[in-house]
């Protein structure tokens, strides 16, 4: 009887450890701003890209900041449609030695503080070759810290025929695009999230 109880106790402990391990993997942090500066928790650094690469005149600035008590990456700028331009973006390359494999996750989680404007989240994968191609999803960010969850199913390919392969993520970008406006978006956390089994 004693040995049976011991076996039962061991099984309980092992199952608890397994549940804890699975729960710890429900979110994979890519950047929580703990590295400081423009460096991400993933190791790569954020960089500013504007439509100047194609002759546009939009102006942008990317910096580390603190907004409402939280350390964040801050993207600011004025988006202009002149010269067939129209975007500023904060881009994080995630390929490193190999592309980021997000196949086991449901989508991307953002903790952001904005200015009431609509922004895009763009993904580039190994299937994306041309600079204007990306998989896009939109979100609106009010002037308050809040969490945005964007499922991978919400992304649409822009000028690309291949379906989104989240197993080969090479870049994630926060983008102000498509209309003339003043951008001001702060990011405190970027992560991959996994929906709980049986959850919504």
Locate each region found by the language model.
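Bacterial N-terminal signal peptides that target proteins for export
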Residues: 1-9
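Beta-rich carbohydrate-recognition modules and glycan-binding surfaces
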Residues: 2, 19-200
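Bacterial N-terminal signal peptides
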Residues: 8-18
């Amino acid at each position: 009887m004693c040995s049976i109880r011991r076996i039962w106790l061991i099984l309980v402990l092992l199952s608890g450890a397994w549940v804890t391990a699975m729960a710890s993997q429900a979110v994979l942090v890519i950047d929580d701003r703990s590295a400081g500066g423009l460096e991400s928790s993933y190791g790569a650094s954020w960089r500013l890209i504007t439509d100047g690469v194609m002759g546009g005149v939009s102006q942008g600035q990317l910096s580390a900041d603190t907004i409402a008590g939280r350390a964040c990456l801050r993207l600011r700028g004025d988006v202009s449609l002149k010269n067939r331009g129209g975007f500023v973006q904060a881009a994080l390359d995630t390929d490193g030695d190999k592309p980021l494999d997000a196949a086991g996750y449901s989508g991307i989680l953002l903790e952001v503080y904005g200015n009431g404007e609509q922004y895009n989240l763009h993904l580039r994968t190994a299937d994306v070759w041309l600079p204007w191609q990306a998989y896009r999803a939109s979100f609106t960010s009010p002037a308050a810290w809040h969490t945005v969850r964007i499922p991978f199913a919400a992304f649409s390919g822009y000028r690309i025929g291949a379906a989104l392969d989240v197993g080969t993520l090479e870049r994630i970008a926060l983008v102000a695009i498509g209309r003339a406006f003043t951008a001001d978006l702060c990011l405190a956390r970027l992560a991959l999230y996994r929906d709980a089994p049986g959850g919504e």
